[in-house]
Regions:
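Surface-exposed, charged secondary-structure patches
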Residues: 4-11, 37-94
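Short, well-ordered alpha-helical segments enriched in acidic and aromatic residues
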Residues: 23-39
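Hydrophobic pocket/interface hotspot
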Residues: 16, 28, 36, 85, ...
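Short beta-strand edge/turn micro-motifs at domain boundaries
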Residues: 84-86, 93-115
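N-terminal amphipathic/basic helix or basic patch
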Residues: 4-15, 23-27
Length: 115
């Protein structure tokens, strides 16, 4: 039985969020596209790359951000090899763009702010 695209996208997003909270670099590695652009909605957008996200994850930077552990994922659209999703957690709200790769769905763009 194969997963639907929406199920696979939710799994990718959970790898990203739960990997962050748990300090699990393997899950984060799997979830993020090599060309990730992650930006925060703030006066200066800034930019986090995949390499920096893996570094921060390995340092356990997300462990204090778990809150109540809630991670609500909504897949808004899937069109061929691209998709968009949003995530609400106790700490973050994010909009994500994903791309289908030979290895599965990966997050290419993320725009976030604190909840």
């Amino acid at each position: 039985m194969t997963k639907t695209d929406a199920e696979a996208i939710v799994d990718t997003v959970l790898d990203y969020f739960e990997g962050w909270f748990d300090g699990d670099t393997a899950r984060m590695e799997r979830a993020l596209h090599p060309e990730l652009a992650k930006r925060r909605a703030a006066e200066e957008l800034g930019l986090l790359t995949k390499a920096r996200m893996l570094e921060l994850t390995g340092q356990g930077a997300g462990a204090e951000d778990r809150g109540d552990g809630r991670v609500d994922v909504t897949v808004h659209d899937v069109y061929g090899d691209i998709a968009t999703a949003s995530v609400d957690s106790a700490t973050y709200h994010e909009y994500l763009h994903l791309v289908r790769t030979p290895g599965g769905w990966q997050i290419a763009n993320a725009l976030w702010q604190f909840s």
